[in-house]
Amino acid sequence: MRLPALLLAVLALAAAAPAAAADAARGQELYESRCGGCHSLDANRVGPAHRGVYGRKAGTAPNFSYSTAVKNATVVWQEKTLDAWLINPQALIPGQRMNFRVALPEDRADIIAYLRQQSGK
């Protein structure tokens, strides 16, 4: 009788445990391989520079020519908004120009952890 109760307790604790922490080092690798063709941390390319993006309002990076949709967006780049953006940019800000998605939740979490780290947050 004690074994089933112990098993239930262990399962309950496992279910309540937080998800694994995002890995910023892996996020850097993913960022460089998947995002680096259009973005960098410090220079605008096809897309805007990303250093300091976490916590910044969309469409406000200096010296980048944003679409009207992004300039007029009220989005602030944080965990949830960056995740939504990487899932489907067009759904978050219709009319924007980015046509790239990151399918796996763990990949998105790691990229976001890297961007947050590079923003000093």
Give the residues covered by each predicted segment:
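Bacterial N-terminal signal peptides
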Residues: 4-15
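N-terminal signal peptide c-region/cleavage motif recognized by signal peptidases
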Residues: 14-17, 22
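Sequence/structural segment immediately N-terminal to covalent heme-attachment motifs in c-type
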Residues: 22-45, 50
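Short glycine/threonine-rich turn/loop motifs
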Residues: 24, 48-68
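Solvent-exposed, acidic/flexible segments
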Residues: 24, 28, 43, 75, ...
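A generic structural signal for secondary-structure junctions
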Residues: 43, 54-58, 87, 116
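Short Fe-S-cluster ligation motifs
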Residues: 63-83
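C-terminal capping alpha-helices of c-type cytochrome domains
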Residues: 78-121
